[in-house]
Every structure is written in structure tokens, then in C-alpha cells.
């Protein structure tokens, strides 16, 4: 759930069936498009970036690619990505996405609210929700309380792993790693965060 760029899901090669969900329409259009052979560009100019941002529905697959892959920090149309060394972010993003898609050719990509996803029996669920007190893709603040309530319910019949920085007391961290985040293109605003992987306490004995 909240599959994003699928960087984690693409490495889980031992699963025979994968259902990857995200509520971002253009992201799922991109993933399905690449899966079905859509040819991504090797370069996007700033003028093209601005045009695509203003005409999102002309080519939703391309919009998904440019909106994330050619934007600063991978944030949805968060500004045309550039640096002093002239990195070609479009080519970089294309290479990364195509590499990840090699192991996702049999995956099913769907676009739903996470609560609407039908779960087969005995699922292994990996969720990477927006951080608590953030807006996620849109302007509306993500409701973390509802998500953790959902995670409690889902953990009764499935094993659910949640990537977050913090969690309610009944969720236990089984892994953590510090990362450096950057808020601006000049890398002058950096800060350290610790990413953690949580499971509900009822599932703790199943993952050790």
C-alpha cells in the first residue's frame, strides 16, 4: 500500500503475487504504462516540464513520469529538478524505474483508497503511508489515526509491516535506520530522520 516508486516492492522477488496500490492516479498510470511498454523520454526540458504541469491529462503516463521523476526530491511537481553539475534527472529516473519494473511485470497496479483494497487471505502487507502530520500528495492532511486503526484491524488476519518514524504504543519497531533529508535544491536545509519498520504487537512472534 502507498507503493510510490516501488523501490521496496521491486526487491521482494520471492512473492508470486503482488498487488501494488496507490491513490495517486498519475503514478498508477505511469506504472501500468511502463509495464505495458510505454517508452519514456531520456530528457525533459524545463519548458516541457512547465507545459506538462499545465496540461496534465494530455498524457497521464508522461505526466506521472515528469511530475515525480523530473521534480526536485521526487515531490509531485515540486519544481524542475536541476543541480550545478547538470544531472539529467529524466534519464536517471527512467533508468531507475525500468530497473525496478523488471521484477514487477506480473504485479497488479491499482488506484484506490487503502481502505478499499480487497485483501486475499493471509496477506503480507507493506505500507509506506505519508508521515504523521503531513499532507501526502494533496492539500488535505493525512489522517494517521484512521490509518493506525486500519492497521490494527488488518493485523488480526494478516502480517502488516509499516514504514514510519513514529507509531502508537501497540506497534513495535523491528528495524530502524537514520537518513538525511534535504528540503531545497541547494542542500542547505538538511536534517536527520530515523525511518522505522513497525508491526503490531500481535504479530511480533511471527516476524522474529
Question: Residues of each region from the PLM?
Answer:
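Class I S-adenosyl-L-methionine
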Residues: 1-19, 23, 106-127, 131-208
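Class I S-adenosyl-L-methionine-dependent methyltransferase module
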Residues: 16-111, 115-116
Amino acid at each position: 500500500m502507498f507503493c510510490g516508486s516501488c523501490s521496496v516492492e521491486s526487491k521482494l522477488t520471492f512473492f508470486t503475487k503482488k498487488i501494488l496500490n496507490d491513490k495517486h492516479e498519475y503514478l498508477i498510470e505511469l506504472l501500468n504504462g511502463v509495464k505495458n511498454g510505454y517508452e519514456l523520454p531520456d530528457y525533459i526540458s524545463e519548458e516541457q516540464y512547465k507545459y506538462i504541469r499545465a496540461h496534465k491529462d494530455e498524457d497521464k503516463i508522461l505526466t506521472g513520469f515528469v511530475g515525480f521523476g523530473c521534480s526536485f526530491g521526487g515531490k509531485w511537481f515540486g519544481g524542475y529538478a536541476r543541480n550545478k553539475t547538470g544531472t539529467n534527472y529524466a534519464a536517471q529516473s527512467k533508468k531507475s524505474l525500468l530497473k525496478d519494473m523488471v521484477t514487477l511485470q506480473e504485479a497488479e497496479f491499482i488506484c484506490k483508497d487503502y481502505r478499499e483494497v480487497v485483501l486475499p487471505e493471509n496477506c503480507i502487507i507493506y505500507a509506506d503511508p505519508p508521515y504523521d502530520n503531513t499532507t501526502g500528495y494533496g492539500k488535505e492532511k493525512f489522517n494517521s489515526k484512521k490509518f493506525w486503526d486500519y492497521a490494527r484491524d488488518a493485523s488480526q488476519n494478516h502480517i502488516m509491516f509499516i514504514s514510519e518514524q513514529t507509531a502508537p504504543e501497540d506497534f513495535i519497531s523491528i528495524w530502524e535506520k537514520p537518513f538525511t533529508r534535504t528540503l531545497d535544491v541547494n542542500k542547505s536545509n538538511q536534517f536527520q530522520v530515523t525511518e522505522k519498520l513497525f508491526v503490531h504487537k500481535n504479530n511480533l512472534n511471527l516476524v522474529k
